[in-house]
């Protein structure tokens, strides 16, 4: 949605970590106005990277530019203007008495310190980049929880209209008592970060990128819905833990390039349209398919049969399966099965295993298989082996086509559909006669010949002895 804008801001702000430490001041706003206006500050200077900003009661300071500060306090108000950026470097962030209005279109608030003290309110774009905070009490984690039971405001419902990004060392934990979080754009969970949506609802309208760990340790409360695509990136310590919750739901595609795992009754519900794919296979307790999804990777279900209310799409060009582990007994069919083919045409004797389980039950409300050449038929073995097969023999004969590129002539035909045919040739200036001979390599389409204009005419045909 606005991911590029956020990362551009972070690139610019990275230089703030190396700012000079030779000056630090406590600067007070004496009048309401724009942050960039030196006339509203008692020092005659705008608060900077190493300064604290005192906003007294009755004062409203509007951040109308890219501002940076260590700490904001007192009982006044800070208002974000459209497309402005406020970066807060100190661990104490914003005093709980200070009001922050951060909903203007395109604005971004960045916390570089301890996210525990970040203001729990509504934002447009929100960034946690906890890069300069170290927990002084080992062996606790090197990050603090945000918006959980121990937060100064307690668990608080929040709306982030744009994107929310957590990088560095940040832990987000939604407490119960209605601490729902609604994100209108993308959610980016960086390496070394954890998002635990325990006890409340998490809604992301657009895409979710998981580089750290996404989990829900209290699946009995709340639900989690992602309207766009979910991408799980490679991670040695993170991934997507679907354990202890049956209420993960996706409206787009799932791309798994890292670990997805879970035990018990953890499940993902695929409610929209897309593809389940990635460089890594998926192993989770079970899935629900309510929408239309192409199976683009192998999915192993550890404990429970899938709930198939929507449409499953398998492509014969791939070998992906839905596997139900031994010991979990029956895999039950329902919904619609649509088998397509983007690869070579099936031939008699081919078998395609789509499902792998100890036992099979139920039935699809409808099935659709790719068309076959005349004489071939599909055999539906789904109820016994989770597979479909091709039987019969092709009738008719292939049609040879030609194309020329420079001095190369290419002959093509459906050699997979019509096996056994080969190219024969004869050279004869007087026309076609009976002296056909094998070309040797012309047994599989395509067959390419070099044209020599100095030679007599050459004729080609397909033959099946």
Residue positions per predicted region:
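Short loop/turn positions at the edges of beta-strands in beta-sheet-rich folds
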Residues: 57, 168, 244, 382, ...
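Acidic glycine-/aspartate-rich tracts in secreted/extracellular proteins
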Residues: 34, 132-133, 317-319, 342-346, ...
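Extracellular beta-sheet-rich ligand-binding/adhesion modules
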Residues: 24-328
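Sec-dependent, cleavable N-terminal signal peptides
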Residues: 1-25
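Extracellular, surface-exposed repeat/solenoid domains
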Residues: 159-160, 300-303, 307-391
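Generic recognition of long tandem-repeat/solenoid scaffolds
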Residues: 109, 195, 202, 217, ...
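Short, surface-exposed terminal/edge motifs of secreted or surface/virion proteins that either
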Residues: 62-63, 147-149, 361-367, 433-439
């Amino acid at each position: 949605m606005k991911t590029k804008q956020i990362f551009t801001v972070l690139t610019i702000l990275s230089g703030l970590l190396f700012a000079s430490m030779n000056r630090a001041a406590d600067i007070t706003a004496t009048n309401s106005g724009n942050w960039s206006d030196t006339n509203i500050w008692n020092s005659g200077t705008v608060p900077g990277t190493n300064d604290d900003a005192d906003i007294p009661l009755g004062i409203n300071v509007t951040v109308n530019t890219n501002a940076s500060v260590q700490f904001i306090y007192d009982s006044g108000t800070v208002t974000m203007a459209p497309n402005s950026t406020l970066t807060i470097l100190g661990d104490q962030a914003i005093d709980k008495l200070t009001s922050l209005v951060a909903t203007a279109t395109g604005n971004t608030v960045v916390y570089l310190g301890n996210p525990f003290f970040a203001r729990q309110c509504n934002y447009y774009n929100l960034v946690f980049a906890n890069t300069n905070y170290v927990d002084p009490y080992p062996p606790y984690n090197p990050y603090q929880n945000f918006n959980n039971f121990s937060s100064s405001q307690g668990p608080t419902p929040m709306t982030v209209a744009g994107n929310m990004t957590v990088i560095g060392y940040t832990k987000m934990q939604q407490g119960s008592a209605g601490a729902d979080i609604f994100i209108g754009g993308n959610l980016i969970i960086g390496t070394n970060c954890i998002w635990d949506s325990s006890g409340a609802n998490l809604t992301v309208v657009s895409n979710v990128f998981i580089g750290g760990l996404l989990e829900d340790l209290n699946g009995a409360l709340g639900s989690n819905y992602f309207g766009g695509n979910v991408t799980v990136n490679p991670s040695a310590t993170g991934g997507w833990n679907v354990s202890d919750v049956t209420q993960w739901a996706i409206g787009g595609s799932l791309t798994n390039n890292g670990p997805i795992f879970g035990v018990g009754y953890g499940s993902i519900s695929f409610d929209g349209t897309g593809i389940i794919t990635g460089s890594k296979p998926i192993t989770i307790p079970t899935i629900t398919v309510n929408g239309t999804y192409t199976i683009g990777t192998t999915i192993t279900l550890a404990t429970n049969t899938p709930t198939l209310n929507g449409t499953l799409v398998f492509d014969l060009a791939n070998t992906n399966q839905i596997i139900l582990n031994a010991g979990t007994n029956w895999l039950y069919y329902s919904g619609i099965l649509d088998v397509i083919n983007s690869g070579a045409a099936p031939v008699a004797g081919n078998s395609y295993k789509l499902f792998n389980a100890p036992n099979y039950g139920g039935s699809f409300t409808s099935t659709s298989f790719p068309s076959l050449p005349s004489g071939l038929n599909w055999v539906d073995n789904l109820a016994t082996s989770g597979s479909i097969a091709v039987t019969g023999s092709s009738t008719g004969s292939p049609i040879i086509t030609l194309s020329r590129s420079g001095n190369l002539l290419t002959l093509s035909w459906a050699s997979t559909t019509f096996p056994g045919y080969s190219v024969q040739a004869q050279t004869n200036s007087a026309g076609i006669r009976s002296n056909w001979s094998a070309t040797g390599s012309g047994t599989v389409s395509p067959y390419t010949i070099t044209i020599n204009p100095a030679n007599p005419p050459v004729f080609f045909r397909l033959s099946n002895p």
